[in-house]
Design a protein with these regions (language model features):
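Short alpha-helical segments that sit at the start of domains
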Residues: 1-17
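N-terminal, charged low-complexity regulatory/assembly segments
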Residues: 164-175
């Protein structure tokens, strides 16, 4: 079993959903994926112990997720930084961390997106549909941009992103 980058997108959506009911079809629509991709991703997440299936209710395993984000994600899903493009700001330039970090001379990291309004350096999203899914779900956008700060940020950015994610997961942990 090999975890795929789109599985992290599915896991992020599970965190956002919290204890609310969901279906594979509805999640697939909101993530711009096929239901079979979502289903396969959930199976891999359960096998990797990043999610659990209790009484036909699939939820994130918060402890394991925290450990994976800090100790696994930055080494497994390293982002590709590329050319200058238009897109959606992510990582330290995303909606949560941008107030704490000055842009300086560097262009902000962005997910390439033809509808993007910011010019920056291309930062590969976890999955091709991330910009579309993030545009439709602000909480998901915030979480994915924090995950990107862990994937490709500097030490201070990673530390701050990890703290923000822990706070947010704490809000949904008991849901």
């Amino acid at each position: 079993m090999i975890l795929k980058s789109q599985d992290v997108l599915v896991l992020a959506k599970l965190v956002v959903i919290g204890g609310d009911e969901w279906s594979y079809g509805r999640m697939a629509t909101t993530l711009w994926m096929s239901p079979s991709e979502v289903h396969a991703g959930v199976k891999r997440l359960i096998k990797a112990r990043l999610a659990s299936d209790q009484q036909n209710r699939i939820t994130p395993n918060v402890r394991n997720l925290e450990s994976f984000l800090l100790h696994g994600l930055p080494y497994v899903f390293v982002p590709d930084l590329g050319e200058i493009t238009r897109g959606m700001p992510t990582s330290y330039a995303g909606p949560v961390l941008s107030p704490f970090f000055q842009a300086g001379e560097d262009l902000p990291p962005v997910w390439p997106d033809p509808d993007g309004e910011v010019r920056g350096q291309s930062f590969s999203p976890l999955y091709k549909s991330v910009p579309k899914a993030a545009r439709e779900d602000e909480w998901l956008y915030e979480l994915l941009s924090l995950i990107d700060a862990i994937r490709g940020g500097r030490a201070r950015e990673r530390q701050m992103a990890y703290g923000e994610i822990k706070k947010r997961m704490g809000l949904n942990a008991g849901s």
